[in-house]
Amino acid sequence: MSAFKKLASDTALYGVSTILGRLLNYALVPVQTYAFGQPKQLASNVELYAYIALLLVLYTLGLETAFFRFAARRPETTPKVFSDTLSMVIVITSIATVVLLWLAPDIARWLDYPNQTMFIRWSALIVAIDAITAIPFARLRVENKARQFVKAKMINIGIVVALNVFFIIVCKDVYEGDYLPQLRPFVQYIYDPEIGPGYIFLANLLGNACYFWLLRKAFAGFRFQLDWPEIRTLYLYAYPIMLTGLANVVNNLTDRLFLRHYLPEGFYAGLTNEDALGIYGQCYKLSVFMALAIQSFRFAADPFFFSKAEDKNAPGLLARVTKWFIIVCVLIWIGVSLNLDVLGLLIGPKYRQGLGIVPLLLLGNLFLGIYFNLAFWFKLSDKTKYGTLITVIGAVVTLLGNMFLIPIMGYMGCAVAFLASSVVMTVICYVLGEKHYPVPYDVRSALGYITGAGLLIYASLQIDIPNPWIAVPFHLALFGLSAAVIAVIERDTIREGWARFRRSRKPAPVGSSQ
């Protein structure tokens, strides 16, 4: 039980900070969608941030996971492994960044954003900083320095949010003479209205640059070195992980990269393809609540389960953790899907027509989270080639799904393709895992909760309640009822867990050897 508590504690710490930070960041969605009322204005942001995520996987080469694995096996070599992995990332990142900065005008024309060369360059610098700081962040997780990790992330989010508000609201209003006329000469010096949505990239870049100061202790002891035998060992382990990560990114980002190009012109009356991409990209952010739960769990789970690799009780622990992970994610799926009428107010009016994609995206993320849990079998057994195979299959499903469904269903086709890919990956991973690393998962429980939640969401969406004073209490009551049903079903487990928790809180008897 102590191991379970440790994982829960770390997940809570990473989770509260990650959720709070991302919610602060999500507060920018109404700022951005109201400031840029035409969805096409944010189309390039949606697409370029997808490329940033793609490049980050290529730059880091899966070395974060390799660092976890080798640091857990040989803790005494952690400083050397840290230097080796970070040195590799620095070399790759430096070369790629120079190329991107040089080719930025050509890339802007190729992406059909010819006037946004500076946006490309800022994006290149953003991904460079993210890549270089990824290994120091991994070091904090390996060394169980969650508070330092959290502090750096929170300060970064605060800076990015503040700079967005400063550029997009304050500078814009002062420049246009709405208030504080005495500051207009200063604002004219730093603010150019032609940049517009580009200030989102600039704010991100300036916030990320602060990481080098915030993580200065995590860089301690780093020496640039290229120990080729060690690097080869790290690379051979990490390369399949990188391909897995790349396929995962393709699964998550193909929709935003394909939508503008595969959507027939005029598919949505009165909207351009750029408008459709802007709508999809902003509505997609409402699935952030599920992604946050998954990300928070993974921050704690990766180093935790690697440290338990040789423990004979690891399969049973993984099964229990996965069961409760699914329960929490199901409650998030229900809570968000039933309250889209309220959550939709967070985005500008012209963006709300895409809210129908959110329940499917949430379900896709739920299955993706289950897959990440199941995937520990090939990481713990050093059979990462299976992870590559599974995610490549998922990527193919995503690519083909978007190519065929976008022309027929528009951005709803993107959501369906993502869900299909996540389900396929989860099923394949489970079947292979049962052969190579059996884990006693409670499959009946998982399918029951997901099916029941899906039926509830579908039924509630068929009931149109235009009055929010009736709709909101009704939806909250349905959510509460769902939580109560789960509590009744799991009452024995909850009662046992509560009893163990209370016992663990009692002080040890005087004279006890414990």
Label the model's feature ranges.
Residues 1-7, 175-199, 210-252, 300, ...:
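Interhelical loop/hinge segments that connect adjacent transmembrane helices in multipass membrane
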Residues 461-514:
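Membrane-proximal transmembrane or re-entrant/amphipathic helices at the cytosolic face
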Residues 121, 151-220, 244, 392-398, ...:
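Hydrophobic alpha-helical transmembrane segments
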Residues 3-64, 92-101, 126, 160-161, ...:
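Signature of the first transmembrane helix
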Residues 1-26, 79, 83, 228-244, ...:
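N-terminal membrane topogenesis motif
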Residues 72-88, 279-391:
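Specific pore-lining/lateral-gate transmembrane helices of multi-pass inner-membrane transport
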Residues 10-25, 199-215, 219, 228-303, ...:
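Transmembrane helical elements of multi-pass membrane transporters/channels
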Residues 9-21, 48, 60-105, 114, ...:
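Membrane-water interface segments that mark the loop-to-transmembrane alpha-helix transition
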